Amino acid sequence: MPAEKPSAQDRPGAPVGRRVVLGLLAAGAAGVLGGAQLQKGLEAVLGPIGIRDPTGLVGLLPVGNTFRFYSVTSGAPKRDASNYRLDITGLVDNKRTHTLADLQAMPQTNLVRDFQCVTGWRVPEVHWSGVRLSDLLDDAGVNSAATAVRFTSFDGTYSESLTLAQARRADVLVALEMIDGPVTHNHGGPVRLYVAPMYGYKSCKWLSGIELTSEVVPGYWEHRGYSIDGWVGQSNGRNDDPTS
């Protein structure tokens, strides 16, 4: 999801030039001083730039309560109703492969919750809609040996995990819609994970795989020092134990 503010060495892609960055910083300051209309214009421009910014500086711009778009790769391939697949594998009784149409036909749950990035920015009262992860797990049948769930992305790199108890929370969705329509590609669509009570790095974008495992498998950012349990307000997102 999104995947939150990777470092330059972890996120390949075409760099944003120094002049562009300086210009954006100036424009961001103007947006704060120039009112809501200019601010909206900046948000429209900065979103597409942010997804391929290896410097991370775009995430620091004062663009208001809006999403910043990050990817830990140079970008994910696009998927739509014709080629999207979600595989449920691992310690399950029945492996499943769901198309986008399959997921859309299932009972949908609506939530209005904030999205909090570990880097500090927040988008309040986002409208989310999708299939409860617990419903998908029940449909596949969870083996008694399973204690955790691992998620993979069709960007080919990103992964995340939850304990089985966390995954069964009513506010954890396999999201098909957010804000005011289908989840867009930049937001991690057509299907992404949304873990309401945790920082955004736990909400895997471009979701392609759900695997039941016997133990928690640390995800992309956990291998880079982030907490496995990314509860908003109970963790700063970083693992503070220097021995870990």
Which role does the model predict for each range below?
Residues 23-35:
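Hydrophobic membrane-insertion alpha-helices, especially the h-region
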Residues 1-16, 30:
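N-terminal secretory signal peptides
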Residues 3-6, 24, 243-244:
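Mixed-charge, low-complexity segments
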Residues 12-17, 36-244:
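Structured, non-membrane catalytic/scaffold regions adjacent to prosthetic-group chemistry
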